């Protein structure tokens, strides 16, 4: 089965207090086990990952260095996204390669720095929803809004985070290179952090200050690759309605009519579960016999067998 995996933040940083490169590398080693399990089972796997915490951390480091010495330049947001794509891709490709070699599997694992075209008139630019960086208390968030002009929103009851524009992906610039590598048997890591958001200006591609949601980028890649399945891996075993309430209910399988109903009820948090569900819906509608599943990282293999996760069907 040809699968596109979308890896969430927990696949890169398990401990929110440990933001070090060493901590990320160790978490990637654990993530590589779940990825290698799928490859060992004979699945053709391509990988997309998020970058919310990392892009916020890199940006904060750059801003702090500039405050200490204004000779240290500030970098545009799209460039910061490119930094994160290389940083995370480097860790993922090496840990997946290492885990495969332990199992006697010799496959090339490669990261492609990916630009993703967005519409400059996308409404997402006027309504920031994508959380980045660390979690803050309400008081800390209010101070950041006042001092730095950030837009801060509560993130699924876990605290407050900065939110930035999150336009939808229109196309992938490097799609032909990705398709060629996948068809040649490479394990490709692409659209890292949703890809570097760019708009077309004649023959030129211009970066824009935004973070494309990795779930929508993964869906776009899955369509381009004509994948059989889109597997979005996150921190929870199943999608829930009435989340964090006494009557919380885990969903094993939902059809598109139910998806629309739950979205209308506001059951899924913007910037969190909502884009995952919407990306799955879009992929299921993209062709016949398309499989879309939201599951936990550790239960990825079980989710493909129907033993875990939430399956979205027509």
Swiss-Prot record:
It catalyses: hydrogencarbonate + NH4(+) + ATP = carbamoyl phosphate + ADP + H2O + H(+). It comes from the Bacteria. GO terms for biological process: arginine deiminase pathway. One of its GO terms (molecular function) is carbamate kinase activity. Its EC number is 2.7.2.2. Keywords: Arginine metabolism, ATP-binding, Cytoplasm, Kinase, Nucleotide-binding, Transferase. Pfam families: AA_kinase. GO terms for cellular component: cytosol. Pathway: Metabolic intermediate metabolism; carbamoyl phosphate degradation; CO(2) and NH(3) from carbamoyl phosphate: step 1/1. It is found in: Cytoplasm. The keyword DNA damage does not apply. It is an enzyme of class 2 (transferase). Coiled coil: none annotated. NCBIfam families: arcC (TIGR00746), PRK12352.1 (NF009007). Belongs to the carbamate kinase family. Homodimer. This is Carbamate kinase. It comes from Clostridium perfringens (strain 13 / Type A).
